[in-house]
Amino acid sequence: MNKTWIRIVVVTLLAAVVAFWVYFDKQRQHTPEQQLDTTLNAMPAWQVIKEQEPVLHQRILDQMAALQKAGEPEQKIIDTIQPQILHLQMSRLQNAPDANVVNYMTINMEQTAAIQKVSDDACFRFLYPAVKGGVNPMRMLDKDLMTRRMQADADMMRAAYGKNRHTVTPEEREAAVTDVRPIMKTLADKYGEDIQLLQMPEKALGKEKLSCDMVQEMWAKVLALPEQKAAGVIRLAVSEVE
C-alpha cells in the first residue's frame, strides 16, 4: 500500500508548484529582479512561506532569479523549486486542522476533474508528467479554481502554525490504516490488476482514462469519510512522502 500511496499523493499535489511557477513566469518579463519578491507577495502561499520559512523563501527567490538570468527553461525552474515546496506542504499537512487538510485535497481533486474534462490524455499528463510530458494547467483551469487552490495552500500552511494546530498520534495512524484498507480493497476488487497502474503509470499508456478515473475514485472515497477520518488518511498518505 505504501508505494501506491506515495505515487498517488505526489502526483495530485505537484500542480500547486506548477501554478506558482506560471504566476512567476507571467511577471518575470515585466519585473526587475529586485522587485520580484514584492510581486510574488500577491500570492497567498508565498506570503506564508516568507513568514514561516524566511531562509527557504530567500533560497527559492535566489534560485528562480539565477535560473531566469541563465535563460533556463520553464521545466528546469519547476524541477528545482518543486521538491522544496512539496516537502514543506507535506510537513504542514501533519499539523494542519482537519478542515484545512480535507479542503486542500478536495481542491486538488477539483483540479484533476476539470482537466479530465479537457481530455483523458491531458489528465494523465497532469498527474504523471514524467511519463508523457506535463501540461500547463493555467491553459485549462479557470482563474477562480486556481485562485481557490492557492488560497487553500496558504490557509492550510498558516493553520498548521495556528491555535488549532494538530498533533498526529499513533492512534490516529492506526485508525487511518484501518479506514483506508476497505477503500483499497474495493478498488482492487473493481479494477483487478489494473490497480497496479497507480504505482506504475509508465505501463498505463493506452489506459489514460482508467488511470485518471482510479486516482479520482480513490480520493473521492477518502473524502467521503467523516472529516476527522478523511484528514487522518490524508496525513497518513503524505507522511510517506516526507
Language model regions located:
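Generic structural signal for hydrophobic core residues of well-folded globular domains
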Residues: 64-67, 89, 93, 131, ...
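Hydrophobic membrane-insertion alpha-helices, especially the h-region
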Residues: 7-23
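Residues that cap or delimit alpha-helices
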Residues: 89-120, 142-146, 188, 192-193, ...
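Residue-level detector of alpha-helical secondary structure
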Residues: 37-40, 50, 57, 61-68, ...
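N-terminal Sec/ER secretory leader and immediately downstream segment
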Residues: 20-131
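A cross-kingdom marker for long, charged
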Residues: 194-242
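Positively charged n-region of N-terminal signal peptides that target proteins for export
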Residues: 1-4
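Extended amphipathic alpha-helical interaction segments
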Residues: 117-203
